[in-house]
């Protein structure tokens, strides 16, 4: 009995007992359900994995989700070879997480300096929210959304750390455990207000990455896949999407203003005066203590930042490799040569990278068990008059459950097969391509598992500090989800066809412009 108790204490560590039992039940019943009905077992596994993400603040999803994925491979729901194929297919994302996030860590001195100035000068919360949302949207149109979120997380961690040290009775330079609130007594209410303030900024920025990412060829990984199948370059892709994306960008800005003014769904909390005072004092102290060497370091980081933007905007190398150059340049010219100091930069990204590989295992199960097959068949067999609506709706729903890159890849391949077989016209294929791209990018803000950037935010070290749980992310994203989904749907149905014809008439796009090449597999 003593050993059983010890085993249960070790199993999933400090997680609640009910959570441990729930995961144990999942592991016991899954093989039996798979033996009885593989299709049901596949959907159950997806639901269980989403449950582990929803409980991320109770237990990091890597361990429970990893055990579920490991069991799925063991009982034959998918194969190790297929999991490896999914990992290789997403190798660019893996490189990005390994190196780019670590690279941003070494630029946090510049980021904290710049954003502290921004925060202190813009006193209006509404203006600040719009600044975060639109800046994230602009950057995500040219950079990767994960990179943008990594920057925002680094900034938020810096702000939180500065105030937490002072609220705990320390000074700016004191070492402090920012996860421990035990020393905070009088300032607890202010800290909660500051957490709400940071939560709202983080969510505005996260949604901003989706608003900007959908607009351009390089904004999201699935955009490249869709553009390759349709034969669109950077300019044509932008104009093809513009009838939908410009409307959703405007509606996103209006939503940002509305939720802040009406204080809806957890938005509207202003920066507490006490916190502003602490940050202002920190900024003054930082300026006074800054040596010539420190200013040179900031200058180096500015030049590396310029290289980062140019490298990503012009695709001079893969995102991950550009991230590696950022690590090399910042550490070399800022004098960071200690192995342990370099190693700390990877602490944020590697747990999430491991979780993402587990997620690819679940995607492999979805493919092998044909979980989306009935939906795909339904959409492709529908009449042309409702096809665009169905493509948009089902891409949106499935992207909120699964990974939007995977959903977009499956649907664009099926649509290309239908085109090759003569089931749909070239013009209809082009309309469908826009519906797939906007459908996977916009409604997927509904849940953290829809977009890798959202999932990264949920599982980052800032989320437990500011109490940003899965449920709270869904709740705070709700106004954006409703508005973007509806506006996107109406734009696809009523604005897209007419605007596409007008854009073709004025020579901004070519129609149809589709290379009749063989369809690649996923």
From Swiss-Prot:
Pfam families: NhaB. GO terms for cellular component: plasma membrane. GO terms for molecular function: sodium:proton antiporter activity. It comes from the Bacteria. The keyword Cell cycle does not apply. The chain crosses the membrane at residues 25-45, 49-69, 87-107, 128-162, 201-221, 237-257, 302-322, 356-376, 388-408, 446-466, 476-496. Keywords: Antiport, Cell inner membrane, Cell membrane, Ion transport, Membrane, Sodium, Sodium transport, Transmembrane, Transmembrane helix, Transport. Na(+)/H(+) antiporter that extrudes sodium in exchange for external protons. Belongs to the NhaB Na(+)/H(+) (TC 2.A.34) antiporter family. HAMAP family: NhaB. This is Na(+)/H(+) antiporter NhaB. It comes from Actinobacillus succinogenes (strain ATCC 55618 / DSM 22257 / CCUG 43843 / 130Z). The lineage of its organism: Bacteria, Pseudomonadati, Pseudomonadota, Gammaproteobacteria, Pasteurellales.
